[in-house]
Amino acid sequence: MSWDEMYRDAYERVLNSIGKIKGVMLAYNTNIDAIKYLKREDLERRIEEAGKDEVLRYSDELPKKINTIQQLLGSILWSVKRGKAAELLVEDREVRNYMRQWGWDELRMGGQVGIMANLLGGVYGIPVIAHVPQISKLQASLFLDGPIYVPTFEEGLKLVHPRNFEGNEEDCIHYIYEFPRGFKVLNFTAPRENRFIGAADDYNPRLYIRKEWVERFEEIAERAELAIVSGLHSLTEETYREPIKVVREHLKVLKDLNIKTHLEFAFTADEKVRREILGLLSLVYSVGLNEVELASVLEIMNERELADRILAKDPADPVAVIEGLMKLIEEGVERIHFHTYGYYLAITKYRGEHVRDALLFSALAAATKAMLGNIEKLDDLRKGLEVPIGRQGLEVYEVVKREFNVEKGIGEVGDYQIAFVPTKIVEKPKSTVGIGDTISSSAFVSEFSLSS
């Protein structure tokens, strides 16, 4: 069976099974994305005005957070130079005003929870319960129609669509600076499309958890059979203690209720927070991450040389990646889903073709989102079937076949199963925002639907 045939078969199988899922809890980060498509002349002018030498300093090493315009522009350059995504908290009010005046090209649903809620609930039709730190009218308006709910406790637990929530709280805006592959600024050229995110938000970056989610969490959790947890990445050494304590308690509740929980990584600047997140892995069933996130976790596990090997090539060297994933799975999870440009991998303690098929479905969802900008209905994924499989992933597959005896995307590594898929590549994507969340949530829920 060819890869194209496997893609088509996986799509049909998931289409028939995804309706079985009774409910997914999503916590914790939801916000509004203000997307700006970068223009060379505009960015270079701003760099000159801010002081080029100071800006370039931050293009070499990211600050922990943003308090000056130079740090903002330097962080954008950091992402452009490497073609890598990054996200930092913008603390300073003047920098926030600067970003607001710089403006945006479009407003969209943002935050990992918000993006996944619209995909799982609005497109796939799976009931979801979403944690929304601040339910403003603008935030609520960005949720799609469908079985998307937030909990209220006026007369016992009641689930309502965010647009039916009584009240109007604050807007949490994240400014996203997108650039295409080949984007040129100063003497830098972006090796691939990506973005830098500046979070002008006093809630999500410190992992604000709503009172009802702290006091009545078990009641909310009982309405779900799966959970996806994200949003820990913006915490710092100063802010992590109380939120991590609450998250740990929530994960224990989910584990006691036998709810399979997926923890989605994102770029985490603070080393102490990375260490704390690593300490949560024994409480979750599954983890999702990309090459930058894997390397950053391996660094705190004293595996710096391995981390460097993972980042040395594009696409990431699969032998180094699998070596890194094997170290990470020893922290106690059942499943690790790795996604990078060109291919996805899953290392699992259990076996079955459904793991590979879930990766294929998620790659189809990612290609469709890249091609269309947004997925509006499940049938849109048929268009993704026409996107060609990337040369890079097929080349990596030859290495994986040789090194790990993989056939039809499935093999063994030690006591674990390895599933591999080369991904479909959209040469000129409309947007990269939310593609990682699309990949991880689609793979997790579709794998569960195929196995149940």
Swiss-Prot record:
Top-level taxon: Archaea
The family line of this record is: Belongs to the ADP-dependent glucokinase family.
Q: Which residues form the ADPK domain?
A: 1-452
* The protein's Enzyme Commission number: 2.7.1.-, 2.7.1.147
Main site of residence? cytoplasm
This protein's UniProt keywords? Carbohydrate metabolism, Cytoplasm, Glucose metabolism, Glycolysis, Kinase, Magnesium, Metal-binding, Transferase
What is an example of a Pfam family matching this protein? Answer: ADP_PFK_GK
GO terms for cellular component: cytoplasm
Pathway field of the UniProt record reads: Carbohydrate degradation; glycolysis
Q: Where is the active site?
A: D437
- The entry's ADP-binding residues are N290, H339, T340, V426, G436
Can you tell me which residues bind D-glucose? D33, E87, G111, Q112, H174, D437
Question: Could you give a GO molecular-function term held by this entry?
Answer: glucokinase activity
Annotated compartments: Cytoplasm
For binding Mg(2+), which residues are annotated in this chain's numbering?
A: E264, E293, D437
**Catalysed transformations (reactions):** D-glucose + ADP = D-glucose 6-phosphate + AMP + H(+); D-glucosamine + ADP = D-glucosamine 6-phosphate + AMP + H(+)
Recorded protein name is ADP-dependent glucose/glucosamine kinase
Q: How is the cofactor bound?
A: Binds 1 Mg(2+) ion per subunit.
User: What function does the entry list?
Assistant: Catalyzes the ADP-dependent phosphorylation of D-glucose to D-glucose 6-phosphate and glucosamine to glucosamine 6-phosphate.
A GO term (biological process) for this protein? glucose metabolic process
Listed cofactors: Mg(2+)
